[in-house]
Amino acid sequence: LRNGPNPRRPTDHWFVGDGMIHGVHLEGGRARWYRNRWVRTDSFDNDFPVYNPDGTRNLRSSVANTHVINHAGRTLALVESSLPYEITTELKTVGAYDFNGRLTDSMTAHPKICPVTGELHFFGYGSIFKPHVTYHRADANGELTINRPVDVPALTMMHDFALTAGHVLFLDLPIVFNLDIAIKGEGMPYRWDDDYGARLGVLRRDDPFGEIRWFDIEPCYVFHVANAYDDADSIVLQAV
């Protein structure tokens, strides 16, 4: 399966195009079929406000256009601003999936599945209210078992994170939401902030509600993590 943005109408940026899933079914050493289908989110055919009247985000308003994963028997189309959308093996959209009501914020488009435990690790960000970032963990059966806040000083754009055998790594970097720009409609509201700083957060996987240790780094921005692993008493993070 492949997911990506496909604008249906003129737009300022193709990243905001609606998600389209492309699939190839392999059987007996042959491709039995290829098909592509829109991810028909609640906002695909209807106008859904991005924010609710109380200022919280409408998590069902989604383009679901960035990634697609399979975990615990469910196939999920992802975009970091919204809830995941479940699709079938025939690429039909089932609907928004909130882990049986336990997920109350967005889900990153770059979750990590532990190859040893089968756990799904992910986070959500984007709320203008605290906590701005929340870490989540679902077990191998798909039950959401952990929701905990990640303390960051402002609404940072945390696009990706990293997972090692023993740790979860968070990237608190200086691309930050600017509410004034958003209210005035002056383009992309996430901007570089010279005063914000940059740091990496380290959380032990065996103590998921424990302290997150923060380490200051040179200001930068990381879109994607390539690899991360534990190396004796150190942690190695490779990113772009």
Which residues fall in each region the model found?
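Beta-propeller domains
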Residues: 1-240
